[in-house]
Amino acid sequence: MIQKHCYECGTALTERELEGEGIVPYCPQCQQYRFPMYNVAVSMVVIDEQTGQILLIRQYGKPHFILVAGYVNRGEQLEHAVSREVKEETGMTVAHLKFNRTSFFEPSNTLMCNFTAFVTDASEFNPNKEIDSYQWFSPDDARKNIKENSLAAAFLNAYLDEENEKV
């Protein structure tokens, strides 16, 4: 999604060359370059450290299993967003986390940042109203049950492939 108007004054943006950046939207009224804006979200491969199982959830009446995910608040660190989203959606506390990778998700204009979130006490699990259903899966079964051809599947498969390379 490319913005057509300045987010400060509403003037129609033009295109202007910026050294080292190429063509960038420019506001002639503010005399400022306006770099594209997008959302930022985190998604998590949630792993129970005691069992090695992976949590997949269903949300909003949809039939497919996905990863826990949520938007990053303005000014919030990604690591905090991971812990906050896992706590808000599942009630569980993240013991430690590991950054995996990012991917831009065009349909929602969102930079998705994927992490592995390790929990030590799955008995804390207390899903909020955003979660319709959930299931803990072995890594192989998680791979089989996550929504096919989704960004969640791409993140999960990349994580599992990297883990398998370590063995």
Predicted ranges, named:
Residues 26, 66, 114:
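Conserved beta-strand segments that form the floor/walls of ligand-binding pockets within enzyme
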Residues 47-88:
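Conserved Nudix-box catalytic region and its N-terminal flanking loop in Nudix hydrolases
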Residues 72-96, 101-155, 163:
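Unchanged
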